[in-house]
Amino acid sequence: MVTFVSEMRIPVVIPYKPIQPKTRLSCILTDEEREDFAFMMLRDVVNAVKNAGCSPLILATAPVELDDVPVRILEEGLNETINGFCEGNDEPLAIVMADLALADRSAILTLLTSGGDLAIAPGRGGGTNAIYVRSAKMFQAQYYGMSYEKHVRYGTDAGLMVKIIDSFRLYCDIDEQDDLIEVFIHNTGYSREWLISHGFEIAMKKSRIGVKRPGYE
């Protein structure tokens, strides 16, 4: 069991892959750039968590440093590691993915204040982008595959009050080139500044707006 020392702040676990992240952005970013951009998104998520009065904990697949944020290296599978955090832990716990570049203080607080035993913010394609559980020992992680459906079913079967969080900022994970326009429109932090500094700009694509980068059209 892992004990969080958080001075009454809710701990928020942020799973993060620092090496070879975001492969679907390979069409427009180099390997090094993908790692840099993923780190910028992590910084934005950490800031959102801190601004909501919570204590971030980065759960990384390789060593990483970000200011004073504690980092734990993922030595088992994600589900096994999170379940280890939860075992015997009566305290609240949240899990927020590192690619939610649009997340802000308000979105995190919406997750934490739903009033349910288990609050789930779905992601595209049946994934789970963020979770809050009132008592960590009541939860078992079901990530990968149709994790949203599995988490809802687990909470329902366990007799928990399950709340579904309808939040665009928590729903919109950044995985592909077409997602980058959302960063331009809705992000005001590190991720947007990084894109601008690397030559990205808003462009019309047929009947929709998107982003372009000179030399990558």
Swiss-Prot record:
EC number: 2.7.7.68
UniProt xrefs under Gene3D superfamilies: 6.10.140.50, Spore Coat Polysaccharide Biosynthesis Protein SpsA, Chain A
Molecular function via GO: GTP binding; phospholactate guanylyltransferase activity
GO biological process, one term: F420-0 metabolic process
Keywords: GTP-binding, Nucleotide-binding, Nucleotidyltransferase, Transferase
Pfam families named among the record's database cross-references: CofC (PF01983)
Enzyme class (EC, first level): transferase
Catalysed conversion reaction: (2S)-2-phospholactate + GTP + H(+) = (2S)-lactyl-2-diphospho-5'-guanosine + diphosphate
Pathway(s) the chain acts in: Cofactor biosynthesis; coenzyme F420 biosynthesis
Highest taxon of source: Archaea
Family recorded in the similarity comment: Belongs to the CofC family.
Quaternary structure, from the entry: Homodimer.
NCBIfam families membership: F420_cofC (TIGR03552)
Its biological purpose: Guanylyltransferase that catalyzes the activation of (2S)-2-phospholactate (2-PL) as (2S)-lactyl-2-diphospho-5'-guanosine, via the condensation of 2-PL with GTP. It is involved in the biosynthesis of coenzyme F420, a hydride carrier cofactor.
Name the UniProt record assigns to this protein: 2-phospho-L-lactate guanylyltransferase
Organism per entry: Methanospirillum hungatei JF-1 (strain ATCC 27890 / DSM 864 / NBRC 100397 / JF-1)
Gene: cofC
